[in-house]
């Protein structure tokens, strides 16, 4: 098709992905019902598989539209930016609910818990051991992703590769240390409201670190395939925004749950 | 003036004349003073003599007007009395003042025009030229996130961040890793107490044996209702407490075991004694030999 048009917008082609995405979401939530009532996770897993296949191919098509077909004009890019901003806003509100639950319990602990926080029977983590190291790791990954971004804007391919590589490496290192902390934890998710809120907040943050690391890894692969130019690299910028968001959430987690609440 | 006042009582027509004359006198006085001040303002550089001459001329004009008033009849006097003062003042003021005032206005207008021109010129240069929306991203066009100017990309930015990353941040990570893992020590676990808010089990888990969490640690995580795994019999964890019947049965079995143990122990003791005696006999024989 010709790239000439008398309007700046992207009239999307026919695509099966919205339909298969809806099927995947429905299968996932039906699978949750089956899981909770019948102790069977097969339908839930099937729903997740359908969703993963859908998002992979949907984003593959978006990359093709933007990189090879030239359909991402300035107006389209503005729309993508607002989409990403609103998504990150919804993630912020998602984590607000976990912090709300934590503060609800920690600011006025019940008499059954011993009227103290952490509750009786709980030993909390030392915040100046592995949690402090994890904080340094995420802050460092923020610096390396900024290095990659500046290199990309200066048309420096090798420096961008190095910056992205180090960022992904630090994300994986964070995940390894967090898993080690989980294994060595002196409390479980079933140990009072402390264990529940701790593992919910840090668990979802850990999942978001995995998602962000995957996002950056995909950007690294696209960069190695020369998808980005110094002027047109919104996929990378979205990954960087998301990574900075994950970093900031960890700072709040560290200060409130590990340090103050420990 | 006195004649006119006396004429009031004789003939009412002259009363009207007196009123008109008084008004004209007051007006003429004001105008004469006004013209004098205007002249002074306009002719700031002139001498005092010229100002005196102007005053004399105004006085002469006033006298002439008075003479005209006396001579004319009443109707004709009305018409002629009104027109002369206006003409005099208009001629005197108009011819002198405009040359000084107009240039100021013209200069101010010119300045305004010049300012507006400057603003227009500056506005053109400072105004942000928006990119056409149909422009396809890429090539030599500006960054999508910035309108107008292309960002001045300086190579120092990436070099700066490279130095911060490689020589500042990554070594810090390595040092912190060494510090953390070298000073790490194993913590002691708390004594087990079956609090109501701890070790919650409302349903069995859907993974493993249904009683252990996903990240279960056998040393640090206790299991309800018994406690830590290495302190209790694992096979009894999670089961219901035994009933009295079960306890009696268990005690019966225990008693049987105890009886058997005692029998075997007594037999074993006797056997040991025999063996000891036999050993002594052999020892004595060897000594005799």
Swiss-Prot record, chain A:
Pfam families, sorted:
COX3
Going by the record, the broad EC class of this enzyme is translocase
Which of UniProt's keywords are assigned here? Answer: Membrane, Mitochondrion, Mitochondrion inner membrane, Translocase, Transmembrane, Transmembrane helix
Alphabetical GO CC annotations of the entry are:
mitochondrial inner membrane; mitochondrion; respiratory chain complex IV
Top-rank taxon of the source lineage equals Eukaryota
The record lists the catalysed reaction(s) as: 4 Fe(II)-[cytochrome c] + O2 + 8 H(+)(in) = 4 Fe(III)-[cytochrome c] + 2 H2O + 4 H(+)(out)
Report the EC number(s), separated by commas if there are several: 7.1.1.9
Annotated transmembrane regions:
39-59, 83-103, 120-140, 163-183, 198-218, 240-260
Q: Which family does it belong to?
A: Belongs to the cytochrome c oxidase subunit 3 family.
Oligomeric state and interaction partners are given as: Component of the cytochrome c oxidase (complex IV, CIV), a multisubunit enzyme composed of a catalytic core of 3 subunits and several supernumerary subunits. The complex exists as a monomer or a dimer and forms supercomplexes (SCs) in the inner mitochondrial membrane with ubiquinol-cytochrome c oxidoreductase (cytochrome b-c1 complex, complex III, CIII).
* Job description of the protein: Component of the cytochrome c oxidase, the last enzyme in the mitochondrial electron transport chain which drives oxidative phosphorylation. The respiratory chain contains 3 multisubunit complexes succinate dehydrogenase (complex II, CII), ubiquinol-cytochrome c oxidoreductase (cytochrome b-c1 complex, complex III, CIII) and cytochrome c oxidase (complex IV, CIV), that cooperate to transfer electrons derived from NADH and succinate to molecular oxygen, creating an electrochemical gradient over the inner membrane that drives transmembrane transport and the ATP synthase.
Q: What is this protein called?
A: Cytochrome c oxidase subunit 3
Q: Its gene?
A: mt:CoIII
């Amino acid at each position: 098709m010709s790239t000439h048009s008398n309007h700046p917008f992207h009239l999307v082609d026919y695509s099966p992905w919205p339909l298969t995405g809806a099927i995947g979401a429905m299968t996932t939530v039906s699978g949750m019902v089956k899981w909770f009532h019948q102790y069977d996770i097969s339908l839930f897993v099937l729903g997740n598989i359908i969703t993963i296949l859908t998002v992979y191919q949907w984003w593959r098509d978006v990359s093709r539209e933007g990189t090879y077909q030239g359909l991402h004009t300035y107006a389209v890019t503005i729309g993508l930016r607002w989409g990403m901003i609103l998504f990150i806003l919804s993630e912020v509100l998602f984590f607000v609910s976990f912090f709300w639950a934590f503060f609800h319990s920690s600011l006025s602990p019940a008499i059954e818990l011993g009227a103290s926080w952490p509750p009786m029977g709980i030993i909390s983590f030392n915040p100046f051991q592995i949690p402090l190291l994890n904080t340094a790791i995420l802050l460092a990954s923020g610096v390396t992703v900024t290095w990659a971004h500046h290199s990309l804007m200066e048309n420096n391919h090798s420096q961008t590769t190095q910056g992205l590589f180090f960022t992904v490496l630090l994300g994986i290192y964070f995940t390894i240390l967090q898993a080690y902390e989980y294994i060595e934890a002196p409390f479980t998710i079933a140990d009072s409201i402390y264990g529940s809120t701790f593992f919910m907040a840090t668990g979802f943050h850990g999942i978001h670190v995995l998602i962000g690391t995957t996002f950056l890894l995909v950007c690294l692969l696209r960069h190695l395939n020369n998808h980005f130019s110094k002027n047109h690299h919104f996929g990378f910028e979205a990954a960087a925004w998301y990574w900075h968001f994950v970093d900031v959430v960890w700072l709040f987690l560290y200060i409130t749950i590990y340090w103050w609440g420990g | 003036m006195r004649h006119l006042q006396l004429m009031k009582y004789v003939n009412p027509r002259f009363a009207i004349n007196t009123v008109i004359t008084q008004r004209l006198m007051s007006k003429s006085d004001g105008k004469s003073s006004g013209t004098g001040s205007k002249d002074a303002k306009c002719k700031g550089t002139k001498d005092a003599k010229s100002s005196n001459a102007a005053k004399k001329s105004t006085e002469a004009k006033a006298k002439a007007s008075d003479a005209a008033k006396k001579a004319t009849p009443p109707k004709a006097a009305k018409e002629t009395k009104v027109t002369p003062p206006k003409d005099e003042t208009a001629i005197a003021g108009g011819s002198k003042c405009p040359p000084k005032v107009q240039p100021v206005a013209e200069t101010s207008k010119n300045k305004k025009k010049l300012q507006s021109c400057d603003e227009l010129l500056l506005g053109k240069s400072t105004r942000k030229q928006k990119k056409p929306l149909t422009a396809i991203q890429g090539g030599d066009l500006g960054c999508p996130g910035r309108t107008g100017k292309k960002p001045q990309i300086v190579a120092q930015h990436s070099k700066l961040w490279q130095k911060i990353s490689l020589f500042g941040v990554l070594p810090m990570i390595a040092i912190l890793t060494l510090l953390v893992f070298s000073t790490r020590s194993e913590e002691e676990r708390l004594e087990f107490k079956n609090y109501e808010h701890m070790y919650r089990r409302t349903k069995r888990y859907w993974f493993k044996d249904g009683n252990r969490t996903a990240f279960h640690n056998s040393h640090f995580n206790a299991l309800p209702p018994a406690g830590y795994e290495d302190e209790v019999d694992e096979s009894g964890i999670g089961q219901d407490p035994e009933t009295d019947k079960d306890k009696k049965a268990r005690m019966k079995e225990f008693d049987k075991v105890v009886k058997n143990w005692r029998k075997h122990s007594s037999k074993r003791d006797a056997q040991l004694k025999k063996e000891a005696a036999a050993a002594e006999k052999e020892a004595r024989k060897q000594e005799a030999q």
